[in-house]
């Protein structure tokens, strides 16, 4: 009997409040199992990932946040490798301190190889996402890496590790699938219509969505719940280039 990979799609938050339960986690326990949705702050997300490690079952966490920086930025920081970059970032008191320190080194905001190849909306140091980048790396990935969790493709993890954490991006997924990838976030009838178009496509792709959750996803003007649901689908096969071993990759 096939052992199903438990997939968690996570719409992340880098808010100063610790996420304040704004993070959405959509979980699939099986191909024919209805998706389950919960809220968490960043501490709660970390606890959920650790609980998955402890249960010994195969878990894949697809998290919508940048897991690394572009090579030119890393070179400006004078560090080597993903771990060196992550430790350097964690040496700052918070996301704003890190961005201020980074801007004393460079004001350039280069995109990573994955940002180019997989068409993510913006680079990891952009004003709109830098908090997500710092909090994901420093509050989630650094402790997990220290605990032997596999972080694809930058940390191999401990032998026998069944839990994998990776970066994912709903916008990239939507473009890869040829689905509408713009205009589904916001107030008004047109964004709602786009959400109403996207969700049935996810269902046809294999996502079992309870009616109440589907209604919430359509009504959610920020698109957070829909993003989490999209990331609960299986990622497409991909081959990460050598740059990804330092910058990270989008799955």
What do the PLM-derived regions correspond to, one by one?
Residues 2-251:
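RNase H-like (RuvC/DEDD) metal-dependent nuclease/polynucleotide-processing core
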